[in-house]
């Protein structure tokens, strides 16, 4: 008679071999990179992406927005020349040159739609996002593991938390820096709203309170911008659908362009320390969780993190927290 221990070992070995085969043959998502007029940032973004372990197996679509005037067109051409230097770094590089200035929101939403005509999942980067060498591996594993779980609508590359004991977690809050989604989730739920009234139609005061984490996360202020940013539209879409965002416990991306970005305001620089951390240099272990739910403990930490301007990552912030709280908070 075969012992239970022997059966367990065979079962474990079979599961390991099945998982190995699963990820060796998995379908890799294309990357859509959106660029405008920052050649230096674009180069750094592409260099980091090219260092990814799955870069040479990955299709890259670069959507280059057009200029607004003669000066900006000159910088746009510099960006396009920079992109062409990386044609050998990926399985395929397709450069889409916009003939006019689409602006960020239109360039992104139309670019995503173009990729989804031929692919069922997408990884989205902008021209100021440095990725971990294991970023593409992480994103594609997440796509494979949760492809059949429609509640998981978004895969994030960034977290403003640092959770060394939590490889990944689920939250209704999306991060738009180095993210990805599936065609059925995006096409089924995303709407690019044109007014605050349209965006919030049917939502209650309690809904708005939950979206804004009790008022500390004032994301709905973005609804007063014109055009309305795509990311707040997606945030609301995920909330309306009861969706979740798979998010890493350690950030897999770093934003290097806030000082120059389209939506950046100089007065908010002091709030951006947390966004300028080095991405993880280690693979992120992912597993399939049945019936995923948001982690209430992590949600509480996120709500707290929003209020401290990210200075907990600076030496001064850590010292102040040690003095006032009697312990370090990562």
Where are these regions (language model features)?
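Leucine-biased recognition of intrinsically disordered, low-complexity hydrophobic segments
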Residues: 17-19
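An acidic/histidine-cluster motif and surrounding catalytic segment
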Residues: 26-124, 129-330
